[in-house]
């Protein structure tokens, strides 16, 4: 299959995307390979004409394969490899070297990764053994700078490795009903080296995590009970984390599914990808550092749902109502702590007192012979347990509401095939109003902004032309963000807050494409 699409962002800036994939299988189906590749070129986009991009330019190439080999009737070897080359740049004067511009954020990634997996089954398929390993190496060259800074270049290397084993057993009867036991162990390694000498920042972080897990699920047509847990030992923590989970399902009728679940998890006190990012603010930059007293973030979650399935003649419907509640302890927050000797803004990742996230999720699906519709809406409340002070501006009071967390959001997807070779897709997302942090620079002082809500509606029309018996050409076209529901208050100029971006990713854009399938 070969496909290409051209999207005109804002009706003026091109985004070209080409994909190629192919599947090959031997006649006896004992071996197969899936090849894939992608090339993408996106021009930068300046929405307000100030010479600074709201969408950076992008050059990306991906090449890889996934393959399998059946070593016997009850065993299979699977291996995968991928290479990703990605260049991104935003700011102004994009044709000049970064250190000759007012603002540039630029990254150049080279990623190589792969994995190997072996599956072994018993003759009756009651026993299954899975052994797996994967590794990935990332090399990144970056520039995050403002004011023609010649020292804002950086280098990052990251090496990750995961290896593990998983065993499962199917019980015909365990105590009171059929069950499946799953257990295993896993080891993960991550070595991160990040240097930005111009900002006096060096991160040398090596992470080792050893894990063991087990669960048992009893299940029949009417009931299911799951209980399990996971043990994790992180080398940056002096204790073992136990994360239990449980789930109960009950079907009073074949059309109704009742479910309750509990789960827990944690986030380790380590540097993550978002902590490596440096944002231009007020003609300088904002640098994130990790508090030496940072503790792990813990979560406890419960949910309950009712799932209804029914067929009304030729129409199939599904409706879901779900309530959820998550309690976060030692929640990670980001606070201003002053400026360094070069007047760069310092942001510290530290622990807050905690937070609670709760809400209701509603989803519905309907399928007819030539039409499928799915829609969902979430009503959510995300609050810190105690108001958190994020800015040094004394005019900003501490805030309990989580930033960039709307109380209402939703989506819908629909596909129509009124005639055999023609299809139409109409999709949309709704994002409610939310609070966003806006840092001083273009504006005189830090402030909290309450955004408007957004409705992003997209339309795609496609028609398939049969060329030969096994060859089909599809031609498609459409519009993204039909109502041009897009942010209209970007900062301008060299003193902008580059992180003050919210809402849909692109303005109203038009696209055409074609696809050849063999």
Model regions: which residues?
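Outer-membrane beta-barrel translocator/receptor signature
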Residues: 1-49, 56-63, 74, 470
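Transmembrane beta-barrel strands of outer-membrane/channel proteins
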Residues: 6-10, 35-41, 79-83, 131-137, ...
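Surface-exposed extracellular loop regions of Gram-negative outer-membrane beta-barrel proteins
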Residues: 28-47, 130-145, 180-188, 195, ...
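Membrane-embedded beta-barrel scaffold of Gram-negative outer-membrane proteins
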Residues: 29, 35, 128-144, 259, ...
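Flexible loop and strand-edge segments within Gram-negative outer membrane beta-barrel domains
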Residues: 42-62, 70, 74-129, 135-158, ...
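Structural signature of Gram-negative outer-membrane beta-barrels, strongest in the C-terminal barrel
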Residues: 72, 176-180, 186, 200-327, ...
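Gram-negative outer-membrane beta-barrel transporters
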Residues: 219-224, 318-327, 348-439, 515
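C-terminal beta-signal and adjacent terminal beta-strands/loops
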Residues: 329-330, 430-439, 463-518
């Amino acid at each position: 299959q070969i496909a290409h699409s051209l999207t005109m962002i804002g009706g003026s800036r091109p985004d070209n995307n080409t994909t190629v994939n192919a599947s090959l299988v031997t006649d006896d189906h004992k071996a197969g390979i899936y090849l894939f590749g992608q090339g993408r070129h996106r021009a930068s986009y300046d929405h307000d004409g100030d010479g600074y991009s709201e969408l950076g330019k992008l050059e990306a190439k991906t090449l890889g394969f996934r393959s399998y080999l059946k070593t016997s009737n009850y065993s299979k070897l699977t291996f995968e490899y991928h290479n990703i080359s990605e260049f991104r740049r935003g700011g102004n004067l994009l044709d000049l070297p970064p250190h000759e511009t007012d603002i540039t954020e630029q990254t150049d990634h080279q990623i190589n990764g792969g994995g190997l997996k072996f599956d072994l089954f018993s003759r009756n398929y009651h026993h299954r053994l899975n052994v797996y390993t994967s590794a990935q190496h990332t090399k990144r060259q970056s520039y995050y700078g403002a004011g023609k800074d010649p020292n804002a270049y950086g280098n990052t290397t990251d090496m990750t490795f995961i290896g593990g084993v998983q065993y499962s057993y199917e019980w015909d009867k365990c105590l009171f009903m059929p069950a499946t036991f799953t257990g295993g162990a896993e080891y993960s390694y991550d070595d991160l080296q990040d240097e930005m000498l111009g900002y006096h920042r060096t991160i040398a972080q090596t992470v080792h995590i050893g894990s063991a897990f087990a669960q048992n699920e009893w299940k029949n047509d009417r009931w299911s009970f799951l209980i399990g847990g996971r043990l994790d030992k992180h080398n940056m923590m002096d204790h073992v984390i136990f994360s239990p989970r449980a789930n109960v399902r009950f079907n009073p009728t074949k059309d109704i599914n009742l479910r309750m679940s509990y789960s827990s998890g944690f986030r380790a006190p380590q540097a993550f990808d978002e902590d490596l990012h440096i944002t231009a603010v007020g003609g300088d930059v904002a640098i994130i550092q990790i508090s030496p007293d940072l503790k792990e973030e813990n979560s406890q979650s419960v949910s309950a749902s009712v799932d209804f399935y029914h067929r009304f003649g030729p129409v199939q419907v599904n409706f879901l109502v779900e309530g959820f509640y998550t309690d976060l302890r030692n929640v990670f927050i980001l606070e201003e702590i002053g400026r360094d000797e070069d007047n760069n803004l310092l942001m510290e990742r530290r622990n807050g007192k905690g937070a609670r996230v709760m809400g209701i999720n509603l989803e519905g699906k309907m399928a007819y012979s030539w039409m499928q519709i799915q829609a969902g809406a979430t009503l959510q409340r995300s609050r810190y347990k105690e108001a958190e002070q994020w800015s040094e501006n004394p005019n900003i009071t501490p805030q309990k509401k989580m930033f960039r967390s709307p109380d209402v959001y939703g989506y819908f997807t629909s596909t129509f095939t009124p005639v055999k070779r023609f299809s139409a897709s109409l999709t949309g997302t709704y994002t409610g109003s939310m609070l966003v942090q806006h840092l001083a620079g273009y504006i005189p002082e830090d402030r909290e902004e309450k955004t408007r809500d957004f409705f992003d509606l997209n339309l795609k029309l496609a028609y398939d032309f049969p060329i030969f018996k096994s060859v089909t050409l599809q031609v498609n076209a459409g519009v993204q963000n039909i109502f041009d529901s897009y942010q209209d208050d970007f900062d301008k100029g060299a003193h902008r807050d580059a992180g003050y971006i919210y809402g849909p990713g692109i303005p109203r854009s038009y696209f055409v494409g074609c696809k050849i399938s063999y």
